[in-house]
């Protein structure tokens, strides 16, 4: 170490300068006492630092245990979470596969049903179009026939009404004719009777008159009788002609009635056939209506299948989203675990660093204790020369300085210049916590019963001046 090299140089200089003055020997003796006090203060400071580092080491050990337990818990939780996420993911994947298979089956079934429905629909549309065209033409034909039939029906009704009116009129005329014939016959009979009577009377009167005036006016009476006979004959001829006309009208009405009956016999089968065709057309229309309803139900089924397919697609997207969320959660948990592991590694490194520093401090303390023991046990004998005593003290001082320089190099102890500039009350600070070690536990210095702050200033200055002189 560099302090040891300096110690060798100082020892060589002390050997070369064999004769020193008595004042220097007295200063050396005083330096020994001051060095003891300085080193005792240094040891107390190191013990206090050791207490703090021991307390910090205990705290770090407790933190390490807590962190190890937390790490175990986190790892266990991670394993549980990973296992749960794997199980959930497996279930979701199984469910997703089942849904995908169901979706594919539904799609295949839907495609097959759609193709069959489309073929059936096209066939039905073609049949419907053909039937529509056929029935449209038939309806047009039937409409024409129906129009003609309606016209014929109206004509028939008109003719029937006319027939009825003519029959009524004929009946009335017949009754009138019969009554008139009866009246005429009755009148004719009565007239004949009356005429007979009148003629008989007239004949009688005429005969009487004729007898009376036969002699006087025979030609005039004959002429008047002939005229009366001609007038009666003309009246009878008129009645006969009128009767013939009525008989002709009666025959014409009967012929019209027979013609109407023949026409009615012809139109009734045609009307019956048209009625049958109309009923058949109504049945076909009902069948087409049923087929349309069936097609509408099939279309509704297709719509429902499409809705089910859309719902399956929505469920599939929701499951994919949930799986993605689970993956993100798994990644977040893994990242948290990695951060926790990094924190644990950092704490472990800090703990190792503290342990290493603690070991170095213990080494420095052991070296200081050994040096102090040697310094305290090294009692100068009377036969030793002052040069040997001085050399031995210089060697002890070099060892102690080397120990202090090592502690200062580690950053765990004050350097000599720091001790010269530190305040007297700086060493009065003690740890606020309890520790495993207290001042005097090493057995090298007495336990602290009073404050040494009043002595540190002079001790530091005397040690520093002594070291400068030896240098």
Swiss-Prot record:
GO molecular function: microtubule binding
GO BP field: sperm axoneme assembly
Biased composition (Polar residues): 451-471
Cleaved signal peptide residues: none
Region annotated Disordered, chain positions: 1-33, 447-471
Coiled-coil ranges per UniProt: 27-190, 225-369
Record's protein name: Cilia- and flagella-associated protein 157
Source species: Danio rerio
